[in-house]
């Protein structure tokens, strides 16, 4: 099985900056305390986690639908990770997944159980079992 890698270099104290280099990317992503907990431009770990969940979920759902003879035309998954202080420590308290899907011949009511199953079974969701993940399937 493949092993995926990310390398992080942090320079300086809390007001320093870091760079995340993903194994397959040609450029790193800059992140800082302010891009994480304030409104500064830059990436942050929660955004990367949300992206990992949304992409894993979309791939799992596309695979599931294809196996059920309903290949999707497009799936757009959005994930929003919420980070809050819990007992004085920053904690990811939930992730909200939103799905818009164009699946020819499939209604929203028919798509929703497939989306729920993909959410429960994708590897990133399984790794995040301690975090509540909600799913809204939209028209």
Could you say what each language-model-derived stretch is?
Residues 1-51, 58-139:
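Extended beta-strand/beta-hairpin segments
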């Amino acid at each position: 099985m493949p092993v995926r890698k990310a390398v992080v270099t942090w320079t300086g104290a809390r007001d320093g900056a870091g760079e995340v280099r993903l194994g397959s990317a040609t450029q790193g992503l800059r992140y800082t305390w302010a891009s994480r907990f304030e409104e500064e431009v830059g990436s942050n770990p929660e955004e990367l986690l949300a992206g990992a969940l949304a992409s894993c979920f979309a791939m799992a759902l596309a695979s599931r639908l294809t196996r059920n003879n309903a290949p999707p035309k497009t799936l757009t998954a959005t994930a929003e990770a919420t980070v809050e202080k819990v007992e004085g420590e920053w904690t990811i308290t939930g992730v909200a997944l939103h799905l818009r899907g164009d699946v020819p011949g499939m209604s929203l009511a028919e798509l929703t159980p497939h989306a729920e199953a993909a959410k429960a079974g994708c590897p990133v969701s399984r790794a995040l079992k301690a975090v509540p993940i909600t799913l809204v399937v939209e028209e």
